């Protein structure tokens, strides 16, 4: 990368979104980039024009290339935007470590739980439409939840544990699904009798079941906690996907595609990848790094299955997800089309966990963060191990993907890789290196 180049030269093969392709193809001629007309909705700028240090941004690419050379990750794509403009794009390493093909910026990644913010936004769009209520019981949309029970562990004098089933103190609501206070859980990590029951019943999002069948099955399982009492990472957003289906009268993907993905130009964001040309662009992890948890192998998006997992099933690209984040950065609109009102988006990215809500030991948002409706939300400048502004929001995926939006810094970042074992340490390093590149303040976007 030359000192005056705002972006690493890359080659794009994306044809499905002409505006986005034209925008990113500008990086083929970095010396003349400033003279290029930006594409609508995703313009490019020089780092120095938005208060970023090119030298410090370039260090991110150097770090990632060193990690690839050390065979710790196969490859990665990173995008840094400020002031609503892409200021840095880098693709390093290989798309698939078993095939000698360089990573491209528009390659496809299993984004796992970065599906959750997309589905959460779709749910709030239905709220704005008047077709969904956050305070409504989940049972209004999925009747099987009308008879749900809470599992209470008891231990006798000999140390034997049993599970008593009791009625919930209140109904599980749609808002509970969005903020992970539903009482549902995940069975592939942690311990306890409810989690063991999930494992024994093979409760997982995927396989040869429809979303409706999955929702009915998980409704028969005991809740790990009283609804509203405890934050526990869970299949809540999968159940939310079924709520969206019932409220909209469409399959989850049909609804996402019509209301969000196609209008945003996110044509590479799908649950499955049946097309051979797109299959060739799927990023893969190392052969010995293909599990995200107990009995949870990395899924194969080439195989079309009945279920569309709202909690972790989407495949996407860095440019697609950048479009989604740019819409959020813009207060809910992009290219003249509004998806959410500014008030609704502010509501989503506000902490929804009162002091009375307990947090499990595996509290994924981390110190200094609460949780909104689909996002972890920074609540204080301190506590966390890296700088961020109060109001910053983020989330990531089990396969290694990560994103954050910092409205006070007018900054957003997309990071894509397929390295499940490396996902946590790389996030903090990336945060610190991006923060180091912010050398001037800009007015907040909103």
Spans of model-derived segments:
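Bacterial N-terminal signal peptides
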Residues: 19-31
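Short, well-ordered beta-strand elements
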Residues: 402-404, 410-419
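Short, conserved phosphate/pyrophosphate- and ester-handling motifs at nucleotide-, phospho-/glycolipid
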Residues: 53, 116, 317
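Short, conserved catalytic-motif segment at the N-terminal edge
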Residues: 42-111, 131-133, 147-156, 298-299, ...
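Boundary at the C-terminal end of the N-terminal hydrophobic targeting segment
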Residues: 34-35
């Amino acid at each position: 990368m030359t000192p005056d180049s705002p972006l690493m030269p890359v080659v794009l093969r994306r044809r499905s979104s002409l505006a986005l392709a034209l925008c990113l193809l500008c990086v083929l001629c970095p010396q003349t980039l400033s003279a290029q007309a930006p594409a609508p909705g995703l313009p490019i700028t020089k780092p120095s024009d938005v208060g970023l240090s090119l030298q410090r941004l370039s260090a991110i690419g150097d770090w990632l290339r060193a990690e690839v050379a050390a065979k710790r990750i196969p490859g990665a794509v990173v995008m840094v935007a400020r002031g609503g403009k892409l200021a840095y794009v880098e693709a390093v390493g290989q798309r698939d470590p078993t095939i000698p093909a360089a990573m491209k910026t528009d390659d496809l990644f299993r984004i796992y739980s970065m599906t959750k913010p997309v589905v959460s936004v779709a749910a709030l769009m239905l709220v704005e439409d008047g077709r969904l209520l956050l305070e409504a019981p989940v049972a209004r949309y999925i009747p099987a939840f009308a008879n749900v029970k809470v599992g209470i562990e008891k231990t006798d004098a000999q140390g034997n544990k049993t599970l008593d089933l009791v009625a919930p103190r209140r109904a599980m609501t749609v808002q509970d699904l969005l903020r992970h206070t539903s009482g549902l859980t995940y069975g592939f990590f942690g311990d306890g009798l409810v989690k063991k029951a999930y494992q024994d019943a093979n409760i997982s999002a995927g396989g040869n079941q429809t979303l409706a069948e999955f929702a009915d099955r998980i409704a028969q399982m005991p809740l790990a906690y009283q609804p509203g009492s405890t934050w526990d990472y869970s299949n809540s957003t999968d159940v939310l996907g079924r709520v969206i289906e019932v409220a909209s009268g469409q399959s989850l993907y049909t609804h996402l595609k019509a209301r969000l993905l196609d209008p945003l130009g996110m044509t590479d964001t799908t649950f499955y990848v049946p097309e051979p040309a797109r299959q060739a662009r799927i990023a893969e992890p190392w052969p010995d790094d293909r599990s995200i948890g107990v009995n949870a192998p990395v899924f194969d998006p080439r195989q079309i299955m009945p279920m569309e997992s709202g909690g972790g099933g989407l495949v996407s690209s860095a440019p697609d997800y950048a479009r989604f984040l740019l819409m959020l950065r813009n207060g809910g609109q992009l290219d003249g089309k509004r998806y959410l009102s500014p008030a609704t988006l502010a509501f989503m990215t506000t902490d929804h966990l009162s002091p009375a809500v307990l947090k499990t030991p595996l509290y994924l948002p981390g110190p200094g963060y609460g949780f909104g409706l689909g996002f972890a939300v920074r609540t204080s400048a301190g506590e966390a191990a890296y700088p961020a502004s109060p109001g910053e929001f983020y989330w990531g995926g089990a396969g290694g993907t990560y994103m954050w939006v910092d409205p006070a810094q007018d900054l957003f970042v997309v990071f894509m890789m397929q390295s499940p074992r490396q996902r946590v340490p790389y996030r903090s390093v990336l945060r610190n290196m991006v923060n180091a590149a912010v050398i001037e303040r800009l007015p907040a976007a909103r």
